[in-house]
């Protein structure tokens, strides 16, 4: 019998080990250890990267979020009921991408870009990464062009510019979504493309928003990204980033876009749920430590970019055009508490906030914009000239009125000047009221502000301010159409427009037809 030398045995074993290729298999493949609540733990996958797509059997995908020493924590994108312990998982070497392009306009898609409106598949083939780095300081341009929301209270006192991030904050059911939807409706003829991201809302609410956009002719100009309350936390967390990528498509090609995130409080809650299930240490209000970064990396992507950036991005196909992505994030507060964790975070990230107040809403002042607390940090430079010129006294009148109204409750007799200020404040407050789904043109808005600024409302009964304004606008659009068209086109204020408005209002008031 042939005997083997111990050294020969060692050589054979070494040779076998050298030939055995387990590294590639073990590093790019893994085994599912546990599945629960949309979270999968995988053993192996040593080469996986943060945010990488992981493929499971049956065409199910996940996203790697926790990279630990001997396991990976991932969220499942979609239904996880088909996954079971012991199944294989593979690295794909790709990060999550969603469809982008003008083919998405007029469509309702989910957080992964799949159409959910029953209008058939999307025709485009272009996709882009969901997570992208925001443009650097060098590529940015200052905000100096307006986004007209169509609301007097906003465009006159808290103007929004192209490339700005303006927060809409307030309690539930006081008109935050209504304000944002009206802003989208007002863009249908402005050349600004819109993206509406619904996060954690009822499907009936989303369907109602889509119907209103369609009725007002704005859906053809809008992409709706829906991650309803029935969707998984992973899709609610991803939806804003998907919508932002779709909006950036227009920005990077020298176009202007507006994106509404409705609302980021629910995204933060979804992210908190994912983080707690991944066993990450909780912080204030049980949110994870990186919840600020969650919103800052999203909102920093909204910007106005320079001509050089657009030219570089399009390889010279588009020249001499700036692009912009304007963001209107919405935050829901609890009982008006703006000092909670998520509201303070988003206030510090954005370029101003529109604060909606429950007390004003309940007293019939709609939109319930509190001009004293609301601010636009960069929009002033972007405001239309005529609106800027005529709105100077509006904010002051409202601020003085609020102060005097509180004082007048205790004082029995008021002097003439104080009484006049109070009455003027009441008239301006009444003038700032506006119906939903009725955004105003620049000329209509300028006319209302002119009447208030130049004292033409002094002898109009407070109860009739609304009907006076409607009749005045109808009169000017009928008998002074040329003047109104001129204001809408140029947005300038000069002596000719001043004289035309003054003469027209005096003539209208003489008719007493309101």
UniProtKB/Swiss-Prot annotation:
Entry-linked InterPro entries = ATP_synth_asu-like_sf, ATP_synth_asu_C, ATP_synth_asu_C_sf, ATP_synth_F1_a_nt-bd_dom, ATP_synth_F1_asu, ATPase_a/bsu_AS, ATPase_F1/V1/A1_a/bsu_N, ATPase_F1/V1/A1_a/bsu_N_sf
Cellular component annotations (GO), alphabetically ordered: plasma membrane; proton-transporting ATP synthase complex
Q: What's its top-level EC category?
A: translocase
Asked if the keyword Amino-acid biosynthesis belongs to this entry, the reply reads no
Catalyzed chemical reaction(s): ATP + H2O + 4 H(+)(in) = ADP + phosphate + 5 H(+)(out)
Membrane topology qualifier:
Peripheral membrane protein
- This protein's source sits in the domain of life called Bacteria
Q: What is its main location?
A: membrane
Q: Which residues bind ATP?
A: 170-177
Site feature: Required for activity: 374
Q: Name one GO molecular function term.
A: ADP binding
The compartments listed are:
Cell inner membrane
**Which Enzyme Commission number(s) are listed?**
7.1.2.2
What are the UniProt keywords, alphabetically?
Answer: ATP synthesis, ATP-binding, Cell inner membrane, Cell membrane, CF(1), Hydrogen ion transport, Ion transport, Membrane, Nucleotide-binding, Translocase, Transport
- Would I find Nucleotide-binding among this entry's keywords? yes
The task this protein performs is described as: Produces ATP from ADP in the presence of a proton gradient across the membrane. The alpha chain is a regulatory subunit.
The Swiss-Prot or TrEMBL record describes its family as follows: Belongs to the ATPase alpha/beta chains family.
Listed under subunit, the entry gives: F-type ATPases have 2 components, CF(1) - the catalytic core - and CF(0) - the membrane proton channel. CF(1) has five subunits: alpha(3), beta(3), gamma(1), delta(1), epsilon(1). CF(0) has three main subunits: a(1), b(2) and c(9-12). The alpha and beta chains form an alternating ring which encloses part of the gamma chain. CF(1) is attached to CF(0) by a central stalk formed by the gamma and epsilon chains, while a peripheral stalk is formed by the delta and b chains.
- Stated name of the protein: ATP synthase subunit alpha
